[in-house]
C-alpha cells in the first residue's frame, strides 16, 4: 500500500526527523497514533482508483482529504521540510489536527456512510483483474484487521487509542472481518467452477471490508481528540445500527447475502480436498435470535469449530469431504436465514421453514451428528497409546468426589455415571490379573482389553470435566456416556469370551520355531572382556564335580551371545567335554525345536525324531547325556518357564558337566543358577572400546596416526556399548580414511547409533508387561547422564497412575517391585543401594535406552520434550500437542512460551540441564506461575524439580496429584485445600530462609489424599482447629519437616497421621530433663529423623516406635539414661545414626546386654563421646560401624572383636588410639575368626591434601584413604610410594601416623 508520492515524501521526511529526538510516553503515543492514521489513509488513497470506491464512501473521503490538504499544502511543506529550527512535534500536532478536521467535516456532510449498492451495479467484467484476486482481497482485509485490532489491546485511558465502552462493538467488527477473510480463503481453495461467481464474491467481500474499515476509521477512536463531535454513547449506537444494517436488503428485492448463497451453492458440486487451516466455521453472524433452533445451530457450529483444531491432519483429511458438505450446508442455511429475515421482520420459525422450503430442525441434525463425531474423534486420536493400569483406580475415587462436590452440575448424568462406576469396579479384578501376569501367549489379548478399558476411563474423566465446566452440550455428553456404557459392555463380552476359550488357546496356538526367531550367527572374533573370559573359563574347567550353570546376563548389545559362543568354541574348553550342544531359545520358542537342536548336535540328524512327542524327545536327550560329561549352551532365555522346559533334560551325575546360559534378565539368570553366581556383563572400558573400533575398521592393520585422536573420541562417544561401536565401525569402514570425514561422523554420531540400535532395544520393550511399559517410557522425561532419585521417580509414577493397586500392599512397595523388574531386565542401571536393606536409592539409564524412551514415547503420544533449542515455534504446533501427553522442559522460558498450546496436557516435568542441587538457591529467578496455569486445566503433575520459585500456590487445579517447587512465602493459603486430589506436595525454601517458620493452614488436613508432604520448618497455623475439626490424614506416609515446640504439638500431629512410615522433624529442646515422657509414634513408622532447633539441649520425650528401623538424631544433648530408655522401645531398630550429639556431663555411653538387638549399622559423627562402655552381648547383629570426627573417643570397645556379624569398620578423622583399636579388631576378625569379608577403612584428612581420595591396599585388608593423587604399597618391602602435589613433610606425617597405628616396619 502506497501513499501518493508527494504526501509520502512529506511523511517519510517527518519520520526521519522524529527519530533523532527523545520523547515521553505521552508524546510517543501520539506519534504512534498519527502513524496509525497514516496507515488507513495509505490504503484508502490506494483503493480510491477502483470502481467500487465511490460505492462505499471511500472516494468521497479521499477527495475530501485531498481538497483540505491542498489548501494547507504550503504550510505542510514548510513545517516538515524547511523549518529546521522548529521541533518535529509541531508537524505532528498539525498533522493530527488536519486528519481530525478531515474526519469531522466528512461526518458533518454525511450523517452515516453511504451504504454500498447491489453487486450487479458495481461490478464490471472489465475491472482490473487485481480486484478479483483472492490473495489481494485477503491482504487488504488482513491489513484492516491488524490496524483495528490495536484499539482492542490498549487499556490506558490516557492513550489516544483508548475507546471506552466500545470494546464489544470493535470485537464484533473484527469478527466480521476475520470471517470475511476466512470465507475468501475457503472459497478460493475449494471452488473450481463457475469462476464468474467467485469473481463476484471476491469483489463483494472487498466492498464489505472497505465499508467496515471506513466506519471504523471515521468514528474510532473518539478519545483524546479534543474536538470530537460525537459522545461515546452515540458512537456505540451508530456501530450497533451498522451491524444490524448488514442483514438488511440493499434495496427492495436485492439481498446483501445473495452472492454468498450463490457461491456456496457452487461449492456444493465442487468440494476438493483441502488442508485443515482452511476449514473455518461462520459462527460470527449467528447473533440473530430466530428461536431455540437457531441457538442450537450456533452451539453445534461452535462445538464443531472448537474440536476441529485438535484433529491431526491425517484424520482431518479423512473426514474433510463430509465436513465440507456440512460447513457449506450450514453456510447456505445461515445466509438464507439472513436473506429472508432481512425481508420479514418478526417472522416465526414455521413461516421461515415454509419460506425456505425445508425443515430447520431436520437440516440442523446432520450438523449435530458431525459435531459429535468430530468431538469424539478429536479426543480419541490424541490419546496416548501407552497407559498406566492405575488410571481406573483414580477415576473411581474421583467419580465419588466429583458427584459429591458438583452434584447439581452432574445431576442429569447421575444415572449414567453410576452405571459406569459399577462397570469399572467389576473390571478391577481383570486389570489386576493383567498387572500381575507374566509374559504368555494371551498377554496381547489381555493388554488390548486393558488398553480399551483405560481409554474409556480417559473419556469419562473428560466428559465429567466438560459437564462441570459447561464446555459441551448436555445432549452431547449424555450421548457420549451412553456410548461408553455400550462399549464397556462389548469389552466385558470380549473378556468373557477370552476366558472361555483360554484353555483351548493354550493348546492350539503353535509356538514359532526358534530357527525363525533368530538367524544363526556366524562365529565372531571377540575383542575385549579378556578378564571376563578368563574368569568364565576357570568356572567351566573347575574341579567341582557337580553340575554348574554359568549364567551371563546384561542389556541388549553387550555381546552376551558372542562371548558365550567364544567360550563354547574354545578348544581348551571343548576338549574337556564328551558332548557339546547348543540351542537358541528366543522370545517365542518351540520346545520341540529346542530338543531337536540339542539332539542334532549330540548324536546327529534324524528326520524320524520330528514325529516324536516332546516328552519322548526330552527323555531321549536325558538318556543321551546321562553317562557323559557335557557342555550345553542355552542362548537368549527370556523367562523362567523356558528354562523349566529344558532343565529336566540335563542330568547331574557329578561329572563336572557345565551349562552356559545367556539372558537379558537378572531374575532368569538367578533362577537358573546352581553353584556359580550369575555374571552381570559389564560395559566396555575406553581401551576395549578403541580396540574393537580399530579392529572392525582396519582389520589386522593399525589406525593411521592422523586418525587416532578422532578415532578415540568416536569410540568414547559410543557409550561403551559394543553394539554401538560395531555400528559406528560399519559407517567408518565405508568412508574415506581422512580426518574431515571422521569429524563428520563424530558430529552426527548420536542419531546414527541410536537409529540403528533401536531394533534391539525395541525387542526388549515389546515384551515388557503392560504395566511396565509406561514406567519405562517415563524415564524419557529425565536428562542424559542424570542420576535419578528413586523416591521422586516412584512418587511420579504413582501420581501418573502407572501403579495398579493391590490389596495388602502399599503403592510405594508395588512401584519398587516394578523398578526391580526393570533393573532385572537390564533396562535400568542401579547407581546406589541402601546399605541397610539393599533397596535402590538412585538409578540411571544408558543413553541408548534413554533416547529410545524419548523417541518411542513421542510416537505413542506419551511424552513430548520441549528443548531450549527447539526449532519449531509454539504457534506452529498448536494443533499437534496431544491431549494427555506428558511434557518435559529443560528451561522455564520454554514452559512459558508453550503453555498456551498445552491445554490438555496431563503433566509437566522440568528437567534442568544444570546440576540438580544448588548451593545458593537465592540466585534463581522468580517465576510467575499465575501466567501459565490457566492453560493447564487437566494438569495432574507439576514437577518444577525444586528449582523454580513461584509467586503463588496454585489452587485451581482439581486434578493435580503431584506438585513440587520453591517458595518465598512464610504461609500457605487456606485455599490449598482446593487441590483435593493432591498426593505429593513438596515446597522447598531458599537457603537463606530455611530457618523461617512456615505457617500451615488447618485446611491442609482436609486434603485426605496426601501421601507425601514436605515443607521445611512448618507448624500448624491453628492448633485448636486442627485438634477439633480436621480429619485424619490416613494416607500420609512421608512427613517432613514439621517443627514441634511442645510435646503436645507432636502428639497432636502424630494422632492425625496414624499411618506414617517416614518422619523428619525439628523439635524444641529443653535445658535438662529428670524424667522422660514416652512419645508414642505411629505403629507403622520405619524411619525417623530428629533435628534440634536450639543448640545441644535435651530431647523432650523418649521415642517409642516398635517397628522403627532407622533413627537419626542430630544436635541433641543425651545423658546417660536417654539412649538406654529409648532402646527399650526400639527393639527392631536396624540403623542408628548420631550426629553432633553431646553425651552428658561425663561424655560416656554405656550399652548394656540386650540393647539394640537388631541393629545392623551404627554411625557416630562429630559426637562428644570420650568413654564408650559396651557389654559383651550388646549389638549381636551389628554389621557396620562408622566413626567420623570422634576426636575425644579413647578407643573402640574390645567386644567388637567378638561380634561375628561385623563386616565393616570405617574410621575417619579420629585419634590414634581409635585407629589402633580398629586395626586390632580387624586383625582378630580376619586372622582369628577367618572373617574374609571383613573390611577396615581408615580415612585421614590432611590440611594440604585437596585432591580426590585414592585407595591404598595394605596388609591384612587395611584400606587407607589419602588426599593425594596416587599411593601404592609393597607389602614385602614395607615400602610406601606417594605421588602428587605433596611435599616430603606431608609424606613423613603419613608415615609416622601409620607407624603409630601398628605398622612400625614401614
UniProtKB/Swiss-Prot annotation:
Q: Which InterPro entries match?
A: Apaf_helical, Disease_R_plants, HMA_dom, LRR_dom_sf, NB-ARC, P-loop_NTPase, R1A-like_N, RX-like_CC
Q: Which PROSITE patterns match?
A: HMA_2
At the top level, the lineage of the source is Eukaryota
UniProt repeat feature LRR, residue ranges: 858-881, 921-935, 936-961, 979-1007, 1010-1035, 1057-1081, 1082-1106, 1110-1129, 1130-1153, 1156-1181, 1216-1240
Q: Which residues form the NB-ARC domain?
A: 521-808
Residues that coordinate or bind ATP: 554-561
Q: Does the keyword Nucleotidyltransferase apply?
A: no
HMA domain location: 1240-1306
Residues forming coiled coils: 407-428, 520-542
Membrane topology value:
Peripheral membrane protein
**Cell membrane is among the record's keywords:** no
* GO biological process, any: plant-type hypersensitive response
Q: A GO molecular function for this record?
A: ADP binding
Question: What does the further note read?
Answer: This protein is encoded by the haplotype A genome of the allohexaploid Solanum demissum.
Q: What does this protein do?
A: Confers resistance to late blight (Phytophthora infestans) races carrying the avirulence gene Avr1. Resistance proteins guard the plant against pathogens that contain an appropriate avirulence protein via an indirect interaction with this avirulence protein. That triggers a defense system including the hypersensitive response, which restricts the pathogen growth.
Q: Provide the family line.
A: Belongs to the disease resistance NB-LRR family.
Record protein name field = Putative late blight resistance protein homolog R1A-10
Taxonomic lineage from the root: Eukaryota, Viridiplantae, Streptophyta, Embryophyta, Tracheophyta
Gene (name only): R1A-10
Amino acid at each position: 500500500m502506497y501513499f501518493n508520492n508527494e504526501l509520502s515524501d512529506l511523511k517519510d521526511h517527518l519520520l526521519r526527523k522524529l527519530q533523532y529526538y527523545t520523547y515521553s510516553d505521552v508524546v510517543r503515543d501520539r506519534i504512534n497514533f498519527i502513524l496509525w492514521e497514516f496507515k488507513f489513509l495509505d490504503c484508502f488513497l490506494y483503493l480510491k482508483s477502483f470502481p467500487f470506491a465511490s460505492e462505499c464512501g471511500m472516494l468521497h473521503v479521499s477527495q475530501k482529504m485531498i481538497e483540505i490538504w491542498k489548501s494547507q499544502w504550503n504550510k505542510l511543506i514548510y513545517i516538515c521540510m524547511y523549518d529546521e529550527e522548529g521541533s518535529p512535534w509541531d508537524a505532528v500536532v498539525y498533522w493530527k489536527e488536519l486528519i481530525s478536521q478531515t474526519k469531522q467535516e466528512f461526518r458533518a456532510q454525511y450523517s452515516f456512510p453511504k451504504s454500498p449498492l447491489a453487486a450487479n451495479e458495481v461490478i464490471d467484467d472489465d475491472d482490473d483483474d487485481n480486484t478479483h484476486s483472492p490473495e489481494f482481497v485477503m491482504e487488504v482485509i488482513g491489513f484492516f484487521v491488524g490496524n483495528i485490532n490495536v484499539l482492542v489491546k490498549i487499556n490506558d485511558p490516557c492513550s489516544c487509542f483508548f475507546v471506552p465502552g466500545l470494546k464489544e462493538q470493535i470485537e464484533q467488527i473484527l469478527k466480521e472481518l476475520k470471517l470475511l477473510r476466512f470465507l475468501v480463503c475457503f472459497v478460493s481453495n475449494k471452488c473450481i467452477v463457475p469462476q464468474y461467481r467467485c469473481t463476484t464474491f471476491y469483489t463483494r467481500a472487498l466492498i464489505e471490508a472497505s465499508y467496515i474499515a471506513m466506519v471504523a476509521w471515521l468514528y474510532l477512536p473518539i478519545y483524546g481528540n479534543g474536538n470530537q463531535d460525537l459522545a461515546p454513547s452515540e458512537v456505540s449506537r451508530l456501530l450497533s445500527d451498522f451491524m444490524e444494517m448488514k442483514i438488511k436488503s440493499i434495496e427492495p428485492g436485492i439481498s446483501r447475502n445473495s452472492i454468498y448463497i450463490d457461491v456456496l451453492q457452487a461449492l456444493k458440486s465442487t468440494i476438493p480436498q483441502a488442508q485443515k487451516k482452511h476449514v473455518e466455521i461462520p459462527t460470527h453472524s449467528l447473533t440473530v435470535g430466530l428461536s431455540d433452533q437457531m441457538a442450537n445451530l450456533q452451539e453445534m457450529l461452535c462445538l464443531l469449530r472448537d474440536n476441529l483444531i485438535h484433529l491431526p491432519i491425517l484424520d482431518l483429511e479423512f473426514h474433510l469431504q463430509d465436513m465440507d458438505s456440512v460447513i457449506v450446508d450450514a453456510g447456505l442455511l445461515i445466509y438464507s436465514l439472513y436473506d429472508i429475515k432481512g425481508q420479514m421482520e418478526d417472522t416465526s420459525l414455521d413461516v421461515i421453514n415454509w419460506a425456505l422450503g425445508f425443515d430447520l430442525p431436520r437440516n440442523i441434525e446432520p450438523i449435530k451428528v458431525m459435531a459429535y463425531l468430530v468431538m469424539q474423534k478429536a479426543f480419541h486420536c490424541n490419546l496416548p497409546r501407552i497407559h498406566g493400569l492405575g488410571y481406573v483406580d483414580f477415576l473411581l475415587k474421583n467419580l465419588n468426589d466429583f458427584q459429591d462436590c458438583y452434584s447439581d452440575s452432574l445431576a442429569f448424568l447421575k444415572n449414567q455415571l453410576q452405571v459406569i462406576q459399577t462397570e469399572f469396579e467389576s473390571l478391577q479384578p481383570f486389570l489386576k490379573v493383567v498387572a500381575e501376569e507374566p509374559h504368555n501367549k494371551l498377554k496381547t489379548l489381555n493388554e488390548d482389553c486393558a488398553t480399551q478399558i483405560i481409554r474409556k476411563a480417559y473419556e469419562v474423566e473428560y466428559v465429567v470435566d466438560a459437564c462441570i465446566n459447561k464446555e459441551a452440550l448436555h445432549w452431547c455428553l449424555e450421548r457420549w456416556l451412553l456410548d461408553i456404557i455400550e462399549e464397556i459392555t462389548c469389552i466385558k463380552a470380549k473378556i468373557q469370551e477370552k476366558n472361555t476359550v483360554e484353555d483351548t488357546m493354550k493348546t492350539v496356538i503353535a509356538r514359532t520355531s526358534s530357527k525363525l526367531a533368530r538367524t544363526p550367527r556366524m562365529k565372531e572374533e571377540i575383542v575385549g572382556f579378556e578378564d571376563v573370559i578368563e574368569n568364565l573359563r576357570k568356572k567351566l574347567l573347575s574341579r567341582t564335580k557337580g553340575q554348574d550353570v554359568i549364567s551371563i546376563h546384561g542389556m541388549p548389545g553387550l555381546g552376551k551371545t558372542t562371548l558365550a559362543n567364544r567360550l563354547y568354541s574354545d578348544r581348551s574348553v571343548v576338549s574337556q567335554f564328551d558332548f557339546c550342544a547348543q540351542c537358541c531359545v528366543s522370545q517365542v520358542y518351540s520346545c520341540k525345536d529346542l530338543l531337536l537342536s540339542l539332539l542334532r548336535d549330540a548324536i546327529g540328524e534324524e528326520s524320524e525324531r520330528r514325529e516324536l512327542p516332546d516328552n519322548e524327545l526330552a527323555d531321549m536327550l536325558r538318556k543321551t547325556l546321562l553317562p557323559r560329561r557335557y557342555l550345553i549352551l542355552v542362548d537368549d532365555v527370556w523367562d523362567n518357564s523356558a528354562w523349566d522346559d529344558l532343565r529336566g533334560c540335563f542330568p547331574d551325575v557329578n561329572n563336572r558337566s557345565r551349562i552356559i546360559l545367556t539372558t537379558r534378565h537378572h531374575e532368569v539368570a538367578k533362577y537358573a543358577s546352581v553353584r556359580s553366581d550369575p555374571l552381570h556383563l559389564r560395559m566396555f572400558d575406553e581401551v576395549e572400546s578403541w580396540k574393537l573400533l580399530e579392529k572392525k575398521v582396519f582389520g589386522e592393520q593399525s589406525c593411521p596416526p592422523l586418525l587416532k585422536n578422532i578415532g578415540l573420541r568416536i569410540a568414547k562417544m559410543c557409550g561403551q556399548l559394543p553394539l554401538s561401536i560395531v555400528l559406528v565401525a560399519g559407517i567408518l569402514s565405508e568412508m574415506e580414511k581422512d580426518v574431515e570425514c571422521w569429524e563428520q561422523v563424530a558430529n552426527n554420531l548420536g542419531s546414527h547409533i541410536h537409529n540403528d540400535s533401536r531394533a534391539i532395544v525395541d525387542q526388549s520393550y515389546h515384551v515388557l508387561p503392560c504395566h511396565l511399559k509406561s514406567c519405562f517410557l517415563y524415564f524419557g522425561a529425565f536428562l542424559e547422564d542424570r542420576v535419578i532419585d528413586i523416591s521422586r521417580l516412584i512418587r511420579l509414577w504413582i501420581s501418573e497412575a502407572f501403579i495398579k493397586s493391590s490389596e495388602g500392599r502399599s503403592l510405594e512397595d508395588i512401584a519398587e517391585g516394578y523398578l526391580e523388574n526393570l533393573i532385572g531386565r537390564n533396562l535400568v542401571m542401579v547407581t546406589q543401594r541402601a546399605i541397610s536393606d539393599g533397596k535402590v536409592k538412585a538409578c540411571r539409564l544408558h543413553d541408548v535406552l534413554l533416547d529410545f524412551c524419548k523417541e518411542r514415547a513421542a510416537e505413542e503420544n506419551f511424552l513430548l520434550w520441549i528443548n531450549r533449542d527447539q526449532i519449531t515455534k509454539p504457534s506452529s504446533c498448536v494443533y499437534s500437542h496431544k491431549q494427555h501427553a506428558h511434557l518435559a522442559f529443560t528451561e522455564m522460558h520454554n514452559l512459558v512460551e508453550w503453555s498456551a498450546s498445552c491445554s490438555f496436557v496431563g503433566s509437566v516435568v522440568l528437567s534442568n540441564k544444570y546440576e540438580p542441587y544448588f548451593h545458593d538457591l537465592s540466585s534463581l529467578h522468580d517465576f510467575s506461575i499465575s501466567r501459565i496455569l490457566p492453560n493447564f486445566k487437566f494438569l495432574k503433575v507439576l514437577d518444577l524439580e525444586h528449582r523454580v520459585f513461584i509467586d503463588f500456590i496454585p489452587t485451581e487445579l482439581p486434578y493435580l496429584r503431584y506438585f513440587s517447587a520453591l517458595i518465598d512465602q512464610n504461609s500457605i493459603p487456606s485455599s490449598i485445600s482446593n487441590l483435593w486430589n493432591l498426593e505429593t506436595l513438596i515446597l522447598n525454601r531458599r537457603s537463606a530462609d530455611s530457618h523461617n517458620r512456615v505457617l500451615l493452614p488447618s485446611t491442609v488436613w482436609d486434603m485426605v489424599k496426601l501421601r507425601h508432604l514436605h515443607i521445611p520448618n512448618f507448624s500448624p497455623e491453628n492448633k485448636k482447629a486442627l485438634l477439633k475439626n480436621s480429619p485424619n490424614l490416613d494416607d500420609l506416609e512421608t512427613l517432613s519437616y514439621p517443627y514441634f515446640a511442645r510435646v503436645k504439638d507432636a502428639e497432636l500431629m502424630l494422632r492425625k497421621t496414624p499411618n506414617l512410615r517416614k518422619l523428619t522433624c525439628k523439635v524444641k529442646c529443653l535445658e535438662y530433663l529428670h524424667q522422660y515422657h514416652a512419645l508414642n509414634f505411629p505403629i507403622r513408622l520405619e524411619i525417623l529423623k530428629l533435628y534440634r532447633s536450639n543448640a545441644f539441649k535435651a530431647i523432650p520425650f523418649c521415642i517409642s516406635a516398635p517397628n522403627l528401623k532407622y533413627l537419626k538424631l542430630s544436635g541433641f544433648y543425651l545423658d546417660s539414661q536417654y539412649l538406654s530408655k529409648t532402646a527399650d522401645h526400639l527393639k527392631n531398630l536396624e540403623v542408628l545414626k548420631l550426629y553432633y550429639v553431646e553425651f552428658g556431663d561425663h561424655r560416656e555411653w554405656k550399652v548394656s546386654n540386650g540393647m539394640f538387638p537388631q541393629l545392623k549399622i551404627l554411625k557416630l559423627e562429630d559426637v562428644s563421646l570420650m568413654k564408650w562402655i559396651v557389654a559383651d552381648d550388646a549389638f549381636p547383629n551389628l554389621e557396620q560401624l562408622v566413626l567420623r570426627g570422634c576426636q575425644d573417643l579413647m578407643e573402640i570397645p574390645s567386644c567388637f572383636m567378638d561380634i561375628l556379624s561385623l563386616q565393616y569398620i570405617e574410621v575417619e578423622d579420629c585419634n590414634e588410639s581409635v585407629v589402633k583399636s580398629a586395626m586390632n579388631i580387624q586383625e582378630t576378625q580376619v586372622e582369628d575368626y577367618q572373617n574374609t569379608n571383613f573390611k577396615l577403612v581408615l580415612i585421614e584428612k590432611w590440611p594440604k591434601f585437596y585432591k580426590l581420595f585414592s585407595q591404598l591396599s595394605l596388609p591384612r585388608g587395611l584400606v587407607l584413604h589419602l588426599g593425594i593423587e596416587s599411593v601404592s604399597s609393597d607389602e614385602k618391602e614395607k615400602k610406601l610410594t606417594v605421588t602428587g602435589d605433596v611435599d616430603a613433610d606431608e609424606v613423613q606425617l603419613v608415615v609416622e601416623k601409620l607407624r603409630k597405628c601398628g605398622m612400625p616396619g614401614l
